[in-house]
């Protein structure tokens, strides 16, 4: 018999609690003094570092970019068979769909799961440290995690690659014609699952990119840091994000949030070549 003791002494949302049990190989990594562990099926043990090995670099990059060091006591990633979605940002214990497991022949071209790894890690600031006050404001979780994929690609592979991936993401939003009528912040929906769509993720990430370009990097990232520090270990919503960005930038952003967070639609361009 064996007894394991687990402690989480920092506040986080109940839906982010997770325990995983199984026959796993555990590959130990670290970032600074924080344990970074990868739980994979034993067949994939030789490839775990190739799959997850950029995690410490991501921790360093996101901590610096947000001017807020990773706030939790450890970071683990585990694989789950037949998981209902791609991954889930359980606090300090992310679960990934089995598709994350790849072998050398697949990884030689690219790690197809790299953006998802970045996405779930970024949630530990936007989603776990500060959690959406309700599903209506899911944007402060998922739009940010989606945009983290752009940030990581821009840092690691350059702006052209990041822009290409952003365009691919926005095509996901455009693929559903009904998305044009859906606000980013929605106070009316049939079921909470309705909020997990191309608006909350894909379009929301694009809106954050637009906001970043409007404010400039210094104001944008300092504003995000202020939002995290102001609302840490609690809940957040779009107006609190606006207030932090206004505080740092000195700009009135009501017009932007009214149009892009509390409204629907997208620009329609008529492009002519000569």
Located regions from the model:
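Short amphipathic beta-strand and strand-loop transition segments with alternating hydrophobic
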Residues: 1, 26, 271-274
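Hydrophobic alpha-helical and helix-loop surface patches within well-folded domains
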Residues: 6, 35-274
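Extended, low-hydrophobicity, Ser/Thr/Pro/Gly-biased non-transmembrane segments
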Residues: 1-24
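Short acidic-hydrophobic surface loop/beta-edge motif
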Residues: 24-31
């Amino acid at each position: 018999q064996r007894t394991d003791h687990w402690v989480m002494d920092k506040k986080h949302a109940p839906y982010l609690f997770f325990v995983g049990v199984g026959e796993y190989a555990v590959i130990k990594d670290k970032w600074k003094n924080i344990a970074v562990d990868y739980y994979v099926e034993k067949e994939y043990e030789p490839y775990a570092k190739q799959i997850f090995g950029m995690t410490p670099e991501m921790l360093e990059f996101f901590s610096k970019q947000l001017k807020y060091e990773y706030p939790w006591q450890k970071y683990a990633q585990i694989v789950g068979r037949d998981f209902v979605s791609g991954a889930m940002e359980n606090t300090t214990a992310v679960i990934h769909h089995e598709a994350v497991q790849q072998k050398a022949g697949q990884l030689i071209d690219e790690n197809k799961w790299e953006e998802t790894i970045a996405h779930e890690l970024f949630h530990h600031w936007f989603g776990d440290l500060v959690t959406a006050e309700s599903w209506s404001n899911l944007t402060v979780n998922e739009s940010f995690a989606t945009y983290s994929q752009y940030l990581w690609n821009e840092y690691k592979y350059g702006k052209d690659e990041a822009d290409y991936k952003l365009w691919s993401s926005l095509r996901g939003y455009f693929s559903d014609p009904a998305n044009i009528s859906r606000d980013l912040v929605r106070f009316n929906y049939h079921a909470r699952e309705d909020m997990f769509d191309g608006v909350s993720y894909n379009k929301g990430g694009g809106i954050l990119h637009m906001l970043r370009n409007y404010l400039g990097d210094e104001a944008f990232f300092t504003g995000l840091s202020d939002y995290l520090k102001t609302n840490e270990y609690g809940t957040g919503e779009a107006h609190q994000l606006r207030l932090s960005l206004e505080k740092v930038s000195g700009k009135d952003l009501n017009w932007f949030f009214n149009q892009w967070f509390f409204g629907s639609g997208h620009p329609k361009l008529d492009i002519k070549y000569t």
